[in-house]
Amino acid sequence: MNATTAPLPYSAARLHELAHVLIANIRELAHAGWTPATSSNFSHRLDEQHAAITVSGRDKGRLVEEDIMVVDFDGLAVGRPLRPSAETLLHTQLYRRFPEICCVLHTHSPVQTIASRLYAGSDVIRLEGYELLKAFEGNTTHETAVEVPVFANTQDMQVLAAQVDALLDKQSVWGYLIEGHGLYAWGRNMAEARRHLEAFEFLLQCELELLKLRGTRQVVPVPHS
């Protein structure tokens, strides 16, 4: 049997199904303005060895099924000789490390990008006291804090992936920022990953708005009657 007739090492039917799930969700995020100029990348676990991921350089608001490709967990293209995102390793490292993780979303909204620049020197953004912290899996109260790591940007994905792995060795997180770049968020399925992504977006926007208010006037606590 030659290479042209060799069976695919993954389910084509499952890929077809996941491609439509990815495209529908990515289009919504693109229409929200979170994927400008063909940026951002998105993936979904296909099986125990493969992931479906967006092809590099495609307009995320106009994706079709051919814009979703397959990679193995080393980030190598499988099935079709297409070029995956340069950041594919940041997706596949999560699938290798956490068998329960099935979806990884990476976006470039203005809020995410500005927050990543503003807090770059702090290495982390601490979100505390918000009711919406309960949107993150495992949180059941607002009386807690969630830390969002901020990594320095680099074009060397091996270096960045190693930094992310070192962080995950020490703590559990549902996402992180890359300086001047954007946000990564993930979950056990698309719905959970979207919830985490949207919660990060909302909470980061709240933090930015608070900074603006504190810069223009002193916030005076209202006494309880």
Curated annotation (Swiss-Prot):
Cofactor: Zn(2+)
Keyword Metal-binding included in the entry's annotation: yes
A Pfam family assignment: Aldolase_II
Cofactor note: Binds 1 zinc ion per subunit.
Cellular component annotations (GO), alphabetically ordered: cytoplasm
Ligand binding (Zn(2+)): H106, H108
GO molecular function: methylthioribulose 1-phosphate dehydratase activity; zinc ion binding
Pathway annotation: Amino-acid biosynthesis; L-methionine biosynthesis via salvage pathway; L-methionine from S-methyl-5-thio-alpha-D-ribose 1-phosphate: step 2/6
GO BP field: L-methionine salvage from methylthioadenosine; monosaccharide metabolic process
Keywords in alphabetical order: Amino-acid biosynthesis, Lyase, Metal-binding, Methionine biosynthesis, Zinc
Organism domain of life: Bacteria
Catalytic activity: 5-(methylsulfanyl)-D-ribulose 1-phosphate = 5-methylsulfanyl-2,3-dioxopentyl phosphate + H2O
EC number: 4.2.1.109
HAMAP family: Salvage_MtnB
Similarity comment text for this entry: Belongs to the aldolase class II family. MtnB subfamily.
Role played: Catalyzes the dehydration of methylthioribulose-1-phosphate (MTRu-1-P) into 2,3-diketo-5-methylthiopentyl-1-phosphate (DK-MTP-1-P).
UniProt protein name: Methylthioribulose-1-phosphate dehydratase
